[in-house]
């Protein structure tokens, strides 16, 4: 259920603020979003996989807390990230 190395590197490069940035909230949220989307497709085939569902809920909550942190620190970066990832309507 993890991302492939190439796709993870592409996500990091696309959302990084600097050259060696892998830990900024933008990168972390983008990686979590990709993993969440992967798990959503997994649950379409495996509806009774409750163990993985717990992991999904933990990832969603982690993403939520990172987004609220980013919103408090810099609202423009938050809005740009939301639009870029298509998280809100």
UniProtKB/Swiss-Prot annotation:
GO cellular component annotations of the record: cytosolic small ribosomal subunit
CDD domains: Ribosomal_S15p_S13e (cd00353)
InterPro entries membership: Ribosomal_uS15 (IPR000589), Ribosomal_uS15_bac-type (IPR005290), uS15_NS1_RNA-bd_sf (IPR009068)
A matching Pfam family: Ribosomal_S15
UniProt key word rRNA-binding: yes
SMART domains: Ribosomal_S15
Function: One of the primary rRNA binding proteins, it binds directly to 16S rRNA where it helps nucleate assembly of the platform of the 30S subunit by binding and bridging several RNA helices of the 16S rRNA.
Stored NCBIfam families: S15_bact (TIGR00952)
Family statement: Belongs to the universal ribosomal protein uS15 family.
Full protein name: Small ribosomal subunit protein uS15
Gene: rpsO
């Amino acid at each position: 259920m993890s991302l492939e190395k190439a796709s993870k590197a592409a996500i990091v490069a696309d959302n990084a603020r600097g050259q060696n940035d892998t830990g900024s909230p933008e990168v972390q949220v983008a990686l979590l979003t990709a993993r969440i989307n992967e798990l959503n497709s997994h649950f379409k085939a495996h509806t009774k996989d409750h163990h993985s569902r717990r992991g999904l809920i933990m990832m969603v909550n982690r993403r939520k807390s990172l987004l609220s942190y980013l919103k408090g620190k810099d609202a423009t970066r938050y809005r740009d990230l939301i639009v870029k990832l298509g998280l809100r309507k």
